[in-house]
Structure formats: structure tokens, C-alpha cells
Amino acid sequence: MAKKSMIEREKKRAKLVEKYSEKREALLEEFRTTESPLEKLEIHRQIQQLPRNSAPNRRRNRCWVTGRPRGVYRDFGLSRNVLREWAHEGLLPGVVKSSW
């Protein structure tokens, strides 16, 4: 189980990403379309003024049950350990053990 502080930190990052996503996207689009180096420099400064944790690539996928940061399946939002346990217990509809 991950530390509660790490889980809360990740939730805070998710809120920041949500809050600044429109502004960040607008600035990035303007940066891509602008050709003037001075204007690009100014836009880059504006992007740098945004909170660091508002960048989407700062987020980390975590298991919503245990908070484990590695081995998380995106389709379920579960770590491999919890996924295996729940699949064996039949708690995940449509998930069956592989056989060939």
C-alpha cells in the first residue's frame, strides 16, 4: 500500500492538470502557430509561469485500491496484484483465465 501522502499528492496533481488544461493548451497552440522568435519567447515564459504540477506528464497512474504506482493496467485502473486477485475471485466481469 502506498503512503497516503503520495496518493493525496497525485490527486492534487490531477486537480491542477484539470484546472490549467485549457490555458496550457491555448498557450501551446499559440506557441506552435507563432513564427516570431520574440513572441515564442514570451509565450514560453507564460507557460513556465504555470504551476509545474499542472503539466499532464507529471501525473502517475496509480492503482485506485492500493495506490501502487507500477504495474497498473489502464483498462481497470488496478495494479497487477489486485487484478489477479479480483479476477480469481470473479469480481471482474468478463475477465477469464487464459487457456489454449
Curated annotation (Swiss-Prot):
PROSITE patterns: RIBOSOMAL_S14. It holds the Pfam family Ribosomal_S14. GO terms for biological process: translation. GO terms for molecular function: rRNA binding; structural constituent of ribosome. InterPro entries: Ribosomal_uS14, Ribosomal_uS14_bac/plastid, Ribosomal_uS14_CS. The keyword Glycosyltransferase does not apply. One of its GO terms (cellular component) is cytoplasm. Belongs to the universal ribosomal protein uS14 family. This is Small ribosomal subunit protein uS14. The gene is rpsN.
